[in-house]
Amino acid sequence: RFKKIRRLGALPGLTSKRPRSGSDLKNQLRSGKRSQYRIRLEEKQKLRFHYGLTERQLLKYVHIAGKAKGSTGQILLQLLEMRLDNILFRLGMASTIPGARQLVNHRHILVNGRIVDIPSYRCKPRDIITTKNKQRSKALIQNFIASSPHQEELPNHLTIDPFQYKGLVNKIIDSKWIGLKIN
């Protein structure tokens, strides 16, 4: 993970740690002219590592976004932001996207009253995301919510009730709330 964030910059979904600035000798050696290919590859890798996708999954999302009407890049980011694991991360119910994936895989999360164990589940507007009524599930989420530093900067397409361990998807995300800087 640290090699990835050192090479690509801060990836908030992958880890909460930040790369050190200026002290990296390798970056000074690699600071030549960047080709278009290198820029596109780095941006693609940022997407992959931030959202925790394989190459094949990313290609499927690009294909779906290409078929839809509108800007392919904006639609791609909207599709990725509406994944269940990413929404849990944005709500503050998990500290990272891999942590959110683990919560979903271990069946701690309900969407509209049903257990969902697929992290790539695409959430829709008016979906209600809750935890299981088990004590262990609620304790896990409570620890994440209590320790999450970005409670006040919740995107406007999401609302959370931290006392009932419940989140609500209000609408599809706006482009200004997407947390990753992509060229």
Swiss-Prot record:
SUPFAM superfamilies documented for this protein: Alpha-L RNA-binding motif
Transmembrane segments: none
A single GO cellular-component term on record: small ribosomal subunit
UniProt KW Ribonucleoprotein keyword: yes
Superkingdom, taxonomy of origin: Eukaryota
Keywords, sorted A to Z: Chloroplast, Plastid, Ribonucleoprotein, Ribosomal protein, RNA-binding, rRNA-binding
PROSITE patterns hit by this protein: RIBOSOMAL_S4, S4
Biological process according to GO: ribosomal small subunit biogenesis; translation
Chief location bin: plastid
Sequence ranges assigned to domain S4 RNA-binding in this UniProt record: 82-143
One Pfam entry name: Ribosomal_S4
Compartments, record wording: Plastid, Chloroplast
GO molecular function term, any single one: rRNA binding
Entry similarity comment: Belongs to the universal ribosomal protein uS4 family.
Listed PANTHER family: 30S 40S RIBOSOMAL PROTEIN, SMALL RIBOSOMAL SUBUNIT PROTEIN US4M
Free-text function comment from the UniProt entry: One of the primary rRNA binding proteins, it binds directly to 16S rRNA where it nucleates assembly of the body of the 30S subunit. With S5 and S12 plays an important role in translational accuracy.
Subunit structure: Part of the 30S ribosomal subunit. Contacts protein S5. The interaction surface between S4 and S5 is involved in control of translational fidelity.
Database matches in HAMAP family: Ribosomal_uS4_B
Record's protein name: Small ribosomal subunit protein uS4c
